[in-house]
């Protein structure tokens, strides 16, 4: 039988408690970390047509687009914001393809309170027809929001092709 000295016995007790202490410190650290900012990208396929635009809108890997050569299409693009009393939207970006030489893609972003009231609005436009994508940016005010809504008008299809909302990106701080 092996006899342990007092110092060996203490070190065994400490080594048994060490993992518990480290885990406890880790949990404390994890619980006191500040909330992280969010950066989420949404595909244009999340946008849904308004009732009058249902027959003009189609979806593919380029997102939502208007196939009508006679009328523009209106869509609503949702956001999934985490519930927070202090959530602030820092930036919203859209990637669009505008193929109409006379009408731009137009999107209006709304910050909405819990009761449904509009807190702020921002509108962005594409800058003319182009075969390559364009980035549209909103500069939202630094106020807290409960949720957001974005409505967009996609111009008619032309011989240049159809206009798309491909992706939209949301950046927030807690």
Predicted feature residues:
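Sec/Tat signal peptide C-region and signal peptidase I cleavage site
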Residues: 31-37
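Short beta-strands within extracellular/lumenal beta-sheet-rich domains
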Residues: 67-86
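Exposed low-complexity, polar/acidic, P/S/T/G-rich flexible segments that act as propeptides
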Residues: 107, 153-174
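Short, surface-exposed beta-strand/strand-loop-strand elements in extracellular ectodomains
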Residues: 102-115
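Bacterial N-terminal signal peptides
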Residues: 19-30
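A short beta-strand element within beta-rich, extracytoplasmic domains
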Residues: 87-98
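Noncatalytic modules at the cell exterior or secretory-pathway interfaces
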Residues: 140-158
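N-terminal secretory signal peptides that target proteins for export/translocation
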Residues: 1-13
């Amino acid at each position: 039988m092996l006899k342990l000295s007092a110092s060996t016995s203490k070190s065994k007790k400490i080594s048994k408690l060490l993992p518990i202490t480290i885990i406890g410190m880790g949990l404390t650290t994890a619980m006191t970390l500040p909330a992280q900012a969010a950066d989420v990208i949404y595909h244009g396929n999340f946008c849904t047509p308004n009732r009058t635009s249902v027959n003009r809108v189609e979806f593919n890997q380029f997102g939502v687009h208007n196939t009508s050569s006679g009328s523009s299409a209106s869509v609503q693009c949702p956001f999934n914001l985490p519930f927070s009393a202090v959530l602030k939207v820092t930036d919203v970006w859209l990637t669009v393809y505008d193929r109409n030489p006379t009408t731009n893609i137009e999107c209006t972003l709304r910050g909405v309170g819990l009761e449904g009231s509009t807190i702020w609005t921002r509108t962005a436009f594409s800058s003319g027809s182009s075969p390559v994508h364009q980035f549209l940016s909103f500069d939202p005010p630094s106020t807290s929001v409960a949720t957001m809504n974005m409505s967009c008008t996609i111009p008619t299809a032309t011989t240049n092709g159809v206009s798309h909302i491909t992706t939209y990106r949301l950046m927030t701080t807690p």
